[in-house]
């Protein structure tokens, strides 16, 4: 398990302007402190936008350190076409403080930042063709493991890629890289012989019935158990952009130790990171 750093973040001030009924802008000043004795590179900063009460639908944002703009990303995490979080990456020297200015707007922006992460989910279609999809749901009794290309969503930074199996295993399978770059859009997790000869990475582990590099499992008192039976399974892509990529695996009605559980495993990878953050969310206390 990667030891996470402690970053202290404070929202100092906000200035709200609303020129028209459909137009709004809000400026925030954010103070960040690195209290560790080591430098931090590509440290994620995440702002919960729902707590800001902006008063308008946030459609774009810019983040500034002095006169330097920092790539940022707005993410809708619940599928309601509203941005829930703003994320950006910063470099922080040891025992240092920095101030950032964030401008939120109700106006759309055509601004594009260089991609540092990517998430992919594909489904097979007619004549062996496949389409990019953002999610897929099926009854727990259905075998859709081979319906989805590379058996579930794939997620990557420049340093590593993973895929999450779309079945009762929900195994996390790694794809190792030789060069620092995004590759999954080109290789789809299965590089050709020519691509491997040109320095592309490859599926690095035969996971069988294991947890791969790490996966949540049940426990029957003597051994780990897969996530079954369930009423319904869904896997989806939530974000893919310059700062982070997010995918989810959701099960409804998991029969486990006398309970019916609804669970979401949310996987987040940031640019410049090999580690992947996994949040396990239940709809009620266990």
What annotation goes with each model-predicted range?
Residues 99-103, 248, 277-281:
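Residues within well-ordered beta-strands of beta-sheet-rich folds
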Residues 22-128, 138, 142, 150:
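Alpha-mannosidase-like glycoside hydrolase catalytic domains involved in N-glycan trimming
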Residues 101, 106-228:
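Solvent-exposed N-terminal domain segments of exported/luminal and surface proteins
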Residues 263, 274-286:
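Acidic (Asp/Glu-rich), glycine- and aromatic
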Residues 195-272:
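Extended, loop-rich substrate-binding clefts of extracytoplasmic carbohydrate-active enzymes
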Residues 133-140, 250-258, 277-279:
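Gly/Pro-rich turn-and-neighbor structural signature
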